[in-house]
Regions:
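"…together with the soluble PPM/PP2C metallo-phosphatase catalytic core" -> "…together
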Residues: 2-155
Length: 155
């Protein structure tokens, strides 16, 4: 158990400080280049820098890389790649709005690392029926959930 705590603390610390340190820099650069939008959550017409996801993705990816160094398993690599690909789709969508059908399809392809690296467990445990193995259901669930989450986070 102790061997899991130290890598987790290192990953969390790196993620926190990379986001905390990089966010003001990203905001300054975006404001300097006049890449801002009106904040829809304020009564005043306050301008905010966009896209701000760069500092967040650096924090996520850096922590996943640290975890992968300590634990080189396919599940971490799959999440790392899927997150990065989804970030690229979101960045493209921020720069040039994608059509209604294209963004979900592009995000569905981002699920490929999870499926190709087998980073899912196809065993379902039902209290009444016991354990059932349905691999196609899990693959379909992954392909549908990545676009849903991607659209929820980056809408």
């Amino acid at each position: 158990m102790e061997q899991l705590i130290i890598p987790a603390i290192i990953a969390i610390t790196i993620a926190f400080f990379s986001v905390y340190g990089l966010t003001p820099f990203v905001i300054r650069v975006l404001e300097k280049r006049n890449i801002t939008v009106v904040d829809a959550n304020k009564k005043e017409k306050t301008m905010v820098a966009r896209p701000g996801g760069l500092s967040i993705i650096v924090g996520i990816e850096s922590s996943l890389i640290i975890l992968y160094i300590f634990f080189p398993i396919s599940e971490i690599l799959a999440v790392l790649l899927t997150t990065f690909f989804a970030f690229i789709v979101g960045l493209i969508d921020d720069k040039k709005t994608m059509s209604g059908w294209f963004k979900p399809v592009a995000l569905a392809f981002c699920a490929a690392p999870i499926i190709l690296l087998g980073a899912y467990d196809s065993n379902l445990a039902f209290p009444l029926f016991g354990t059932v193995q349905i691999p196609l259901l899990y693959m379909a669930l992954v392909v549908f959930m990545i676009p849903i989450m991607g659209n929820t986070i980056n809408s």
